[in-house]
């Protein structure tokens, strides 16, 4: 199985886990509790702009949960807002007040519903440490995944705001 955590749009060959039910969601649930999935049953997990929506002290357990459900040599494709880039964008003197507000919403979440909040800012060093602590190996930084049309390839104001990593079990 290929599991898209936080997805909304159906794609052939993929199952969707989302905290909010909609017509394309196969599993309603939370990245923090993957108990509905058996150990080593998933080939690939894709999670774009999901990890920042949980509290930092719960992130390691969430990553360990993903590790548990992945098959041997399974892959985690993970994308998070890159705090280093977002901070650089926010202090850019060429951005106007409206653009800076947009960047700030990328840092703190859009806050359009009860789930659209960011609890933690990730950069490569932090995420790499958490992935290693969850026992992932071969952590590779990539420009994009070319799997879904989502925020992982978003470049507002010329800033590539996503940190995209592939981690192997």
Descriptions of predicted regions:
Residues 1-8, 20-23, 95-98, 139-145:
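Short linear motifs at secondary-structure transitions and domain/linker junctions
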Residues 58-61, 65, 71, 75-168:
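S-adenosyl-L-methionine-dependent methyltransferase catalytic module, highlighting the catalytic core
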